[in-house]
Structures are given as structure tokens and as C-alpha cells.
Swiss-Prot record:
Part of the high-affinity ABC transporter complex FrcBCA involved in fructose uptake. Is also a high-affinity transporter for ribose and mannose. Binds fructose, ribose and mannose. Keywords: Periplasm, Signal, Sugar transport, Transport. Belongs to the bacterial solute-binding protein 2 family. The keyword Transport applies. Induction: Induced by fructose. It comes from Rhizobium meliloti (Ensifer meliloti). This is Fructose import binding protein FrcB.
Length: 341
């Protein structure tokens, strides 16, 4: 996808979309701030926000960090949204703790702030969170991997390809969920890397992209060339891991699992590159977020969480062509009908 950089001042991608008439534009405006503008997940998120903004007559401006982990650009984007008089902000935060003071500044200025995909830390630092149940997403692929391996899971050698050093909540939740599903004690539920299960070879970071996934996989293979299970933060990282394994002739005897459910990722499940993936729905997250900002602007009402949860759950499905007993899943044909990117 061709990128157009419109705001070099804070190293973020910014795009104002005038979907409202001049009289309406002054009434309701919103900001979408994502981690990057290149990951298909966030591209689809922006599409969902833009379509819903057009439908509701909301003026939308979109911003993104230069890379996953670029929190400085997100901080600058929040400042811009406050100065522009936006009614609300949808944010997929790169640094879920470091961004909190700036989020609070926006809330103090009267903006509704909704975390998309990645909960802030603490969760109530945002007015609401619209997200996949990332713990469940991880648990589903962990259960599937354990059942697929059977008794061999007890002697597995597991590599974790994580997101960034700051350990954002989405990273922690997916890791912890996988461990629970696979039968590994995650120890501190809010921390990555404190586990003592001998099956874990190690963790490395990917920045959520293919190049990072390849490098992280190469690093962990040097640590232990007998790795046979790989948990990846997302499908671009999984694709990179596969390339690293292929380069040493290991691609057919290592089980890779992931989270995202984008069309390229679902295709990779169908082709055997990825064993299974948990599919999430970014377009819905963003569309619901724009609806919430419009409602807040019109009535002052804030979103309420899904019953029994502390966030608005936008759904998750396990995609696998080799189903296992006790773990509900959909096949890749159905996954392709629901995918994005």
C-alpha cells in the first residue's frame, strides 16, 4: 500500500478525512491513532473507522507511529487531537503504560478516549476498551497446539516471538493465554519472561513485522535448534519465523501458531505455513469506536463493557483446518470469508 506522510513534525502518519459537511464538521470530530500504517490489521482498522465516520457525518483524522513501539508519535498525535478540539480518540497504544499521562490529559480536556485492541495499563486509564479477548485468543491457539502434539507436548521446546520490549498488554495477554492453553504456568500474569517451565526456550521481540519475526526466530534457533513449537504475536511475525525455519530445513517439523486472522494469515494456515491462528475483527472495533464517540458527543453517554467483562468484546475465532476435540474452531474457507487485509 502506498503511504503518504502528511505530518513529519511528529513522525506520524496523519490523514484528515472530511466526511461531514462544513456545518457538521465543527460538531463532531474524532481521531484514530494506530501503532503503524503498514500492518494490515491497522489498515483495516482505519478503513472501518473511515466508513463509519462517513456514515455518521463525523470528521476523522488518522495518525500512526512510524513503527510498532513508536510511542512518541502517538503522544504528539494526542496533543494535536486535543488542540484540534476532537470529541474523542480511538487509540491502539504502543506503550500501554507510558501513554497514560497523555491519555489523562485528553480526558481532562473533555475527550472520550477508547483503547482499541490493546488495553491500557491500568485498564481504566481509558474511558473504554474495545478489543479482542486477547487472553482467550492466546488460550485457543495454546489448547490447539497442545492437543495437536498430544503426549509430545510434555517434551515440547517452545519459542515465544513477542512484540516489543515494553511488554504492552496485548503481548502479555496473548503470551499468558497461550501458556495457560498449552499447560505452562505463566507465573506473574502481568509479566513476560518470568516463567520457569523447562519447555520454554526463550522470548525474543519482533516489532510485529516479518523481518523482526525472522530475526527473532534465528536468535532462538541459535539458543536451541530443537525448537518445535513457535508462538507468535501476530501473523507477519509468524511469516518471518517460517522463513527462518525454512532456511535451515525445519519448516515442516515446527508448529507455528499466531493471532490476527488477516487474509494473508488465513491463507498461510490453508497452506500449512501457520498451524492455527486466532482471528480478530479490527474493522468492527473501529466502527464501534466511531459510533461511541458520536453518541458521546450527542448525549454525553459513555460505552458500557460486555456483560461479565471489563471491556467491549469484539469477538475471536480459532481458524484451523485440522480441528481438535474440545476446542471450537472454523476452517480456512470460513476464515477467508471473515478475514481482512
Amino acid at each position: 500500500m502506498k503511504k503518504t506522510v502528511l505530518s513529519a513534525a511528529f513522525g506520524a502518519l496523519a490523514m484528515g478525512v472530511a466526511f461531514a459537511s462544513p456545518s457538521q464538521a465543527a460538531e463532531v470530530s474524532a481521531c484514530l491513532i494506530t501503532k503503524t500504517d503498514t500492518n494490515p490489521f491497522f489498515v483495516k482498522m482505519k478503513e472501518g473507522a473511515a466508513a463509519k465516520a462517513k456514515e455518521l457525518g463525523v470528521t476523522l483524522k488518522s495518525y500512526a507511529g512510524k513503527i510498532d513501539g513508536d510511542s512518541e508519535s502517538q503522544v504528539a498525535a494526542i496533543e494535536t487531537c486535543i488542540a484540534d478540539g476532537a470529541k474523542g480518540i480511538l487509540i491502539a497504544a504502543s506503550d500501554t503504560q507510558g501513554i497514560v499521562p497523555q491519555v489523562q490529559k485528553a480526558r481532562d480536556a473533555g475527550l472520550l478516549v477508547i483503547a482499541l485492541d490493546t488495553p491500557l495499563e491500568p485498564l481504566d486509564a481509558a474511558d473504554a476498551t474495545f478489543a479482542t479477548d486477547n487472553l482467550l485468543a492466546g488460550k485457543l491457539i495454546g489448547q490447539w497446539a497442545a492437543a495437536t502434539l498430544g503426549d509430545a507436548a510434555k517434551e515440547a521446546k517452545v519459542a515465544f516471538l513477542d512484540l516489543t520490549p515494553s511488554q504492552p498488554s496485548v503481548d502479555v495477554l496473548r503470551d499468558q493465554g497461550f501458556m495457560i492453553g498449552f499447560g505452562i504456568d505463566p507465573k506473574d500474569p502481568n509479566k513476560i519472561g518470568d516463567e520457569d517451565d523447562p519447555r520454554i526456550v526463550g522470548h525474543d521481540i519482533t516489532n510485529g513485522n516479518e523481518e523482526g519475526g525472522r530475526t527473532a526466530m534465528e536468535n532462538l534457533l541459535q539458543k536451541d535448534p530443537t525448537i518445535n513449537v513457535v508462538h507468535t504475536i501476530n501473523e507477519p511475525a509468524a511469516a518471518g519465523a517460517y522463513e527462518a525455519l525454512k532456511s535451515v530445513g525445519r519448516e515442516k517439523d515446527v508448529l507455528i501458531v499466531s493471532v490476527d486472522g488477516g487474509c494473508p494469515g488465513v491463507k498461510n494456515v490453508a497452506e500449512g505455513v501457520i498451524g492455527a491462528t486466532s482471528q480478530q475483527y479490527p474493522l468492527m472495533m473501529a466502527a464501534l469506536g466511531i459510533e461511541a464517540i458520536k453518541k458521546f458527543a450527542d448525549t454525553g453517554e459513555k460505552p458500557t463493557p460486555t456483560e461479565g467483562k471489563d471491556f467491549v468484546d469484539t469477538g475471536v475465532s480459532l481458524v484451523a483446518d485440522k480441528p481438535v476435540s474440545g476446542v471450537e474452531s472454523i476452517d480456512t474457507k470460513t476464515g477467508m470469508e471473515k478475514c481482512w487485509g
